[in-house]
Every structure is written in structure tokens, then in C-alpha cells.
Amino acid sequence: MKLYQKFPETQVITTKGPLDFYRDVFEKGKWLFLFAHPADFTPVCTTEFVGFSKVYEEFKRLNVELVGMSVDSIYSHIEWLKDIQERYGIQVPFPLIADPDKRLARLLDIIDEASGVTIRAVFLVNPEGIIRFMAYYPIEYGRKIEELLRITKAALVNYKAKVSLPVDWEPGQEVIVPAPSTIDEAQIRMKLPNAKTWYLTFKKYDELPQDQRVV
């Protein structure tokens, strides 16, 4: 899969039961945050599941469906999640996809052919089923969840307000309005107080309508 492509229309089995991405997520107006991990009962993946569990409510508040996946069996998933609960006191609240036949992993092109496991991948998909962000991480590195939340919030503001976000943007900071497409618009833009030049104009975050902001 590539950025801006349509997410596959498919059904999967998870630790919370069957999941149809379009019927259960996109058609309900939700975003999808899908993250793949290489294998159950591995050290880095365990720390990630503890971390993602702690921010589950934050994703839920943003109307984003958080879902994990790997090519392990559903029974391996269940046993691993039980182990996490026993050792860390955390009940993983989001569904974990079992993909032992690697069908979804191959559709997403996230199989490491040498080891046969899923790579450490992330997909953020909007309610139209379009991939708006994707990233791959080495097997030895854990993801920075705080940064993934920031990217998710940026994607939501971009989607709702049709604005861009500058370097190191955080919710509450200025956004960038689209560049003008005609010379007349460019000349008008240069007269605005927040215009750095004709193609770069900022807008205060609190000037966006309330329903276009995230916090």
C-alpha cells in the first residue's frame, strides 16, 4: 500500500470478534489507526501494547479506532494479552487482529519475507478509507506514541479545516492556510497581517471554528 491509496475492503478476526473496516469503522465516520507488530511475547511489542493501552481513551475521544495486528493466531493473542494483564495490571482495550494466513499483511505489503512476520508498521486512514499517514519502524525500535498522537491530531485538523500544519506543530498553535492560486489572490494575501510572503500565511488556531479544532 502507498500513501493516499484506498485501504483494502476486507473483514478480519480480532480478539474482540469479527471486524469489517468499512462497515464498522469508516461508514460510522471514524478514522482507523492500525499498527502492526512483529510477534506476540516479544519485549518491544509488549512495551508498545502497554503504551497504546494507556492512550486508548485519547484515540477514542478523537473518534479514532485503535487496532493492532500481527500474523500470530488468535489463541496466541489471547494468551499474550492475559500475560500483559497479569504482569502489568493492564487490560488491553482495543482489538488485536489475528492474521495467521498473512492475508491482510500481504494486502498491506507489510510482511518481512526473511522472517515471515509483520514489520512494525502504522496506518492512519480517514473515514473515506484513504491512507493519510503510514510509517515503518525497525523491529528493534519502539514507536513514540506521543508523536503518533500528534500526527493523528494534525491529520484531523487538516481534514476538517483544510489547512496545513507547520514544522513541530502542536494543537493550539498557528496553522497554514492554502496558498493562493491566482496573482490577484496573491496580491491580496500579501496585505494580510499573518502573511510572511504570498505563499505562506498563518492563521491563529482559535480563529478556526470549534468543530475544526482538536485538543
From Swiss-Prot:
It is found in: Cytoplasm. Substrate binds at R120. Its EC number is 1.11.1.24. The active site is at C45. Disulfide bonds: none annotated. It catalyses: a hydroperoxide + [thioredoxin]-dithiol = an alcohol + [thioredoxin]-disulfide + H2O. InterPro entries: AhpC/TSA, Peroxiredoxin, Peroxiredoxin_AhpC-typ, Peroxiredoxin_C, Peroxiredoxin_TDXH, Thioredoxin-like_sf, Thioredoxin_domain. Residues 1-157 form the Thioredoxin domain. It is an enzyme of class 1 (oxidoreductase). GO terms for biological process: cell redox homeostasis; cellular response to stress; hydrogen peroxide catabolic process; response to oxidative stress. One of its GO terms (molecular function) is thioredoxin peroxidase activity. GO terms for cellular component: cytosol. Keywords: Antioxidant, Cytoplasm, Oxidoreductase, Peroxidase, Redox-active center. It holds the Pfam family AhpC-TSA. Belongs to the peroxiredoxin family. Prx6 subfamily. HAMAP family: Peroxiredoxin. Thiol-specific peroxidase that catalyzes the reduction of hydrogen peroxide and organic hydroperoxides to water and alcohols, respectively. Plays a role in cell protection against oxidative stress by detoxifying peroxides. Homodecamer. Pentamer of dimers that assemble into a ring structure. The active site is a conserved redox-active cysteine residue, the peroxidatic cysteine (C(P)), which makes the nucleophilic attack on the peroxide substrate. The peroxide oxidizes the C(P)-SH to cysteine sulfenic acid (C(P)-SOH), which then reacts with another cysteine residue, the resolving cysteine (C(R)), to form a disulfide bridge. The disulfide is subsequently reduced by an appropriate electron donor to complete the catalytic cycle. In this 1-Cys peroxiredoxin, no C(R) is present and C(P) instead forms a disulfide with a cysteine from another protein or with a small thiol molecule. This is Peroxiredoxin 1.
